[in-house]
Amino acid sequence: MKFSLCMIVKNEEAVLNRCLESMASAMDEIIIVDTGSTDATKKIATAYTDQIYDFAWTGNFAEARNYAASKATGDYIYTADADEYLEPEELQKLLQLKKVLLPEVEIVQMLY
């Protein structure tokens, strides 16, 4: 199973590294959609992915998330906000899930 991390971000330099560092090893691709950052958000993201896209903010989170999802090639899309992160034990649960996840499963949700 291939997992795509899809994120929409704007001015998240204070938290983005922690988020991506905690999730990167479980993801097969990382897609960052930037809605107009003026800080180092995109520079931080380049340490984890080259799939960074600019998206003009329209005031519609669903539109931005759908744009991010349209860039994904994974079997599953993991969405996260930049201030979210996985604790090591949660990361291990996700890595284990990837090994046993059945193709007919369409939705997985983790508590945080």
Which residue stretches match the model-derived regions?
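Short, well-ordered alpha-helix to beta-strand connector turns
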Residues: 27, 49, 72-74, 105
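Conserved donor NDP-sugar-binding/catalytic core segment of glycosyltransferases
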Residues: 84-112
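Conserved donor nucleotide-binding strand/loop of the catalytic core
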Residues: 42-71
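Acidic helix N-cap motif at the loop->helix transition within catalytic regions
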Residues: 14-17, 39-48, 89
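Short aromatic/hydrophobic "clamp" motif used to bind/position activated sugar donors
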Residues: 77
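N-proximal low-complexity "stem/linker" segments adjacent to membrane-targeting elements
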Residues: 1-25
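A conserved acidic beta->alpha catalytic loop
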Residues: 22, 26, 34-44, 57, ...
